[in-house]
Amino acid sequence: MNRYKIGLISLGCDKNRIDSELLLGKLNEKNDIVNDPNKADIIIVNTCGFIESSKQESIDTILEMAKYKEENCKMIIATGCLTQRYSKELLELIPEIDIMLGVNDYANIQNYIDDFFNEHNKICQCKYSDISINEGKRILTTAKHMAYIRISEGCNNLCTYCIIPKIRGKYRSRSIESIINEAKELANMGVKELILVGQDTAIYGSDLYKENRLSQLLRELSNIEDIEWIRILYTYPEEITDELIEEIKNNDKVCKYLDIPIQHISNTVLKRMNRKSSKELITDNIKKMRKEIDGLCLRTSIIVGFPGETEDEFNELKEFVEEIKFDNLGVFKYSQEEDTAAARMKDQVSEDLKEERLATIMSIQQNVSSKINKNKLEKVYKVLVEGQNDKYYIGRNYQMVPEIDGAIFFKCDKILNVGEFVYVKITDTLEYDLIGVVCDESGQ
């Protein structure tokens, strides 16, 4: 049996990254993984199909990789959300694709590769399934000291703007035992930080155990000796319970960090979005969380330009962002996705107005972030070392998710290792980043 050199490009979210790592895990034993597409016999593109810009990026990337078939590359494989959604269209649009897989067809990828080289017939396996959850050995594509871990797949929320339930299926939790076993394997590989992801992590276990079990999962994960940080992403605010707040408050290994994607704050917009929350519920929960959890860092994401968004609704959102002062905030223009209820709504907002509103929110948040960072001067944080440049080491504290929340640049006289924890005293601030110097826990 031939041993092939395989390159992979992963696009989209961290959940897609996990799928890419599982793909590499399934292929690593009988093939060699390479980073340079010039050296690859097989190139895999794991696509994203969430919004228009991500769809275009996926198509452009496949076309770019297809050029390597003029040189050493013998096969192009496309997989992921875009192929799950548009398999027939992609086969016609990009004939260079040899194998196309959806989001549930990774287990047999080696067999598909062997079959193609034996029979030279294109393969398309994009059958929809909302039963299985991809699990198995992973080849990490993150830094070796941190890893994302998927605790659930799919979504039941049916937000009017979102296509994910049609791509990923109904919400289904992994078992606690399965997650703990994977976390132990990751810890044995040197992982210090676990980042829990799912479409809605707050309702973890509600399908499998008939009750939310995120708090229990956090307790059991914190018993793994070599794991030092546990971080939760994608917790819908209406599902955050008092029990979860208490667990975050009292568990030293759980980062005092919550990512609560509110999407909007106007009740009329939330209703059109088919969101289950309200302005009053969101506001009350934020106040409760900040009161109970000392030093809590809050991130959110919002959508501007949703169909029918009036000036009054947008002004309500602006005022809320100014008042609540999220530590971190991502803002996105509404993307009109076919096969969604929102795409059929009247009063679609123009692209120019979406751009204007996005810029307005970002300007407000830049001012908020700058003021929040200035309040961190002279404070001491536990920092995870991520790397270094010519002048500084680079790291993150509990308030920072990799690649999206900024970083801490700091000096140290001794040599530090990536994945090591140190204490850093903040000496200067930037808009989103911090500057500091290594110290002891007391700040000396």
From Swiss-Prot:
Protein localization: Cytoplasm
The keyword Iron-sulfur belongs to this UniProt entry's keyword annotation: yes
Key words of the record: 4Fe-4S, Cytoplasm, Iron, Iron-sulfur, Metal-binding, S-adenosyl-L-methionine, Transferase
Annotated [4Fe-4S] cluster 2 binding sites: C155, C159, C162
Catalytic activities: L-aspartate(89)-[ribosomal protein uS12]-hydrogen + (sulfur carrier)-SH + AH2 + 2 S-adenosyl-L-methionine = 3-methylsulfanyl-L-aspartate(89)-[ribosomal protein uS12]-hydrogen + (sulfur carrier)-H + 5'-deoxyadenosine + L-methionine + A + S-adenosyl-L-homocysteine + 2 H(+)
GO CC terms in record: cytosol
Start and end residues of each TRAM domain: 374-440
Key word Zinc present: no
PROSITE patterns: MTTASE_N (PS51449), MTTASE_RADICAL (PS01278), RADICAL_SAM (PS51918), TRAM (PS50926)
Cofactor dependence: [4Fe-4S] cluster
PANTHER family: RIBOSOMAL PROTEIN S12 METHYLTHIOTRANSFERASE RIMO, RIBOSOMAL PROTEIN US12 METHYLTHIOTRANSFERASE RIMO
Record-stated family: Belongs to the methylthiotransferase family. RimO subfamily.
Protein name per UniProt: Ribosomal protein uS12 methylthiotransferase RimO
Lineage: Bacteria, Bacillati, Bacillota, Clostridia, Eubacteriales
Gene assigned in the entry: rimO
